[in-house]
């Protein structure tokens, strides 16, 4: 997408991000069909059918707190920002999750993004079983790496070469070292509320779990690790210009989520991404899109295809592993040839490119290539967001929100929300009450106001209707 089309897409995204009645952004040419029908059991938490209880979750979680810090292996799972009992899950399938107490939920977390074709997809699972028969990890080259690399390179406009790693954090760490090695500069610029993993240099005014815990950064991060990290408010071109003027010729790269998902759902304002592209080129800095969340979700070629802006380097994760641990960073060939063993910038990983993650990624991307995928995601997600916001308006709650394709979010504030400062005006106490009420109604949302939500090809119109009905019920109650 370029020119007028890109401007139109950006305008649509902004409208959807801040309006009480968002207009769904118009998709670029879609590549995949609507989902196969899936037979599912009815939700079993309706009043009169089954009392909602999480006793087993509580028992297991209490035991976990004696074994793992806070009882979890990622902070947001502990429900610190929403209150109530963290849910311990037993199984997933399609758009549904079941906890250890037998409660069923319509899921809008999707394992934090990877489950775009639905949980435990039969085709992906069958392929994994066949790969498993040959081994779980080689610690050596395998042909599946070539296959997935070719798919990623053909899909993502900025990527001419790619390096696979094991997480989004690793991908951003590799990209950070790479841009510094290539430019010979040390400073980076990131945006308030944008989360690029838990590497030291990025834990400055980060969103996501750091925002949830109310910490501006983290103990244990030395001042030297963040002294070269500059920050600006997202969507603020003038602030970026000022930082470039004050640090002329010193900034290695600008890192950003092209659509913020770790401070809630915040789309770019018209012209913002274009301005970053121009400013980095003028100064000799690189532009890095962190597409760990948006890659293959907003379009087959990610946010950069959707908005028509090509960065120099991109990071990926989540979807390209189909639910298995994975990450990747890639970019122009001349930049990527700095990476060892082709070049002097060292980065390595024992399990990088392992056959199971490559297999899941290959078959997930194959599904996304089918005609109709992104039109379908756009429709169901738009119906969901409009339905929830309409319910909020009818019950007297100040809310705003929006979506792009299969990514969405809403805030308990009138808005508009253009940056992390705006997002923090949301009534997080009310969100907590809403969240706990939705759990009781059989809907699982991200347990933080500062996280985007996700739909999948497994979600049906009936799922959306049930969710909107549940939201209306809870909003009336709170």
Swiss-Prot record:
Its EC number is 5.4.3.8. One of its GO terms (biological process) is chlorophyll biosynthetic process. Pfam families: Aminotran_3. This is Glutamate-1-semialdehyde 2,1-aminomutase, chloroplastic. One of its GO terms (cellular component) is chloroplast. Homodimer. CDD domains: OAT_like. Residues 1-40 form a transit peptide. It comes from Oryza sativa subsp. japonica. Belongs to the class-III pyridoxal-phosphate-dependent aminotransferase family. HemL subfamily. Residues 15-36 are annotated as: Disordered. It is found in: Plastid, Chloroplast. Keywords: Chlorophyll biosynthesis, Chloroplast, Isomerase, Plastid, Porphyrin biosynthesis, Pyridoxal phosphate, Transit peptide. InterPro entries: 4pyrrol_synth_GluAld_NH2Trfase (IPR004639), Aminotrans_3 (IPR005814), Aminotrans_3_PPA_site (IPR049704), PyrdxlP-dep_Trfase (IPR015424), PyrdxlP-dep_Trfase_major (IPR015421), PyrdxlP-dep_Trfase_small (IPR015422).
């Amino acid at each position: 997408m370029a020119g007028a089309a890109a401007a139109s897409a950006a305008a649509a995204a902004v409208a959807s991000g801040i309006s009480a009645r968002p207009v769904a952004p118009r998709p670029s040419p879609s590549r995949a069909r609507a989902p196969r029908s899936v037979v599912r059991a009815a939700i079993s938490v309706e009043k009169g059918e089954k009392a909602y209880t999480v006793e087993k979750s509580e028992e297991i979680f209490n035991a976990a707190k004696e074994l793992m810090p806070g009882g979890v292996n990622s902070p947001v799972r502990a429900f610190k920002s929403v209150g109530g009992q963290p849910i311990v899950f037993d199984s997933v399938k399609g758009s549904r999750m079941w906890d250890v107490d037998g409660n069923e939920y319509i899921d809008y977390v999707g394992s934090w993004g990877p489950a775009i074709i639905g949980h435990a997809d039969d085709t992906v699972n069958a392929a994994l079983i066949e790969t498993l028969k040959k081994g779980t990890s080689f610690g050596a080259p395998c042909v599946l790496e070539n296959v997935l690399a070719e798919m990623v390179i053909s899909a993502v406009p900025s990527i001419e070469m790619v390096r696979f790693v094991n997480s989004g954090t690793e991908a951003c760490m590799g990209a950070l070292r790479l841009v510094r090695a290539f430019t010979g500069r040390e400073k980076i610029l990131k945006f308030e509320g944008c989360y690029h993993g838990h590497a030291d240099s990025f834990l400055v005014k980060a969103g996501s779990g750091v925002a949830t815990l109310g910490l501006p950064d983290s103990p244990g991060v030395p001042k030297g690790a963040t002294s070269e990290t500059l920050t600006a408010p997202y969507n603020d071109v003038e602030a970026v210009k000022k930082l470039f003027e004050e640090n002329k010729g010193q900034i290695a790269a600008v890192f950003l989520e092209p659509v913020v998902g770790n401070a809630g759902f915040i789309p770019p304002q018209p012209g913002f991404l274009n301005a970053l592209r121009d400013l980095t080129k003028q100064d000799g800095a690189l532009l890095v899109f962190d597409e760990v969340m948006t890659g293959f979700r907003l379009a087959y070629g990610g946010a950069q295809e959707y908005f028509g802006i090509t960065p120099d380097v991109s990071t990926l994760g989540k979807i390209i592993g189909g639910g298995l641990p994975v990450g990747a960073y890639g970019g122009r060939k001349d930049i990527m040839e700095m990476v060892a063993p082709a070049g002097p910038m060292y980065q390595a990983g024992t399990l990088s490119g392992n056959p199971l993650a490559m297999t899941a990624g290959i078959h997930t991307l194959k599904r996304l290539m089918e005609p109709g995928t992104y039109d379908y995601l756009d429709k169901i997600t738009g119906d969901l967001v409009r339905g929830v916001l309409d319910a909020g308006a009818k019950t007297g709650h100040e809310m705003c929100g929006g979506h792009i394709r299969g990514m969405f979010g809403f805030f308990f504030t009138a808005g508009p929300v253009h940056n992390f400062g705006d997002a923090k005006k949301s009534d997080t106490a009310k969100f907590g009450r809403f969240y706990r009420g939705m759990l009781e109604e059989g809907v699982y949302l991200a347990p933080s106001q500062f996280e985007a939500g996700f739909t999948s090809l497994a979600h049906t119109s009936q799922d959306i209707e049930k969710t909107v009905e549940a939201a209306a019920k809870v909003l009336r109650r709170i």
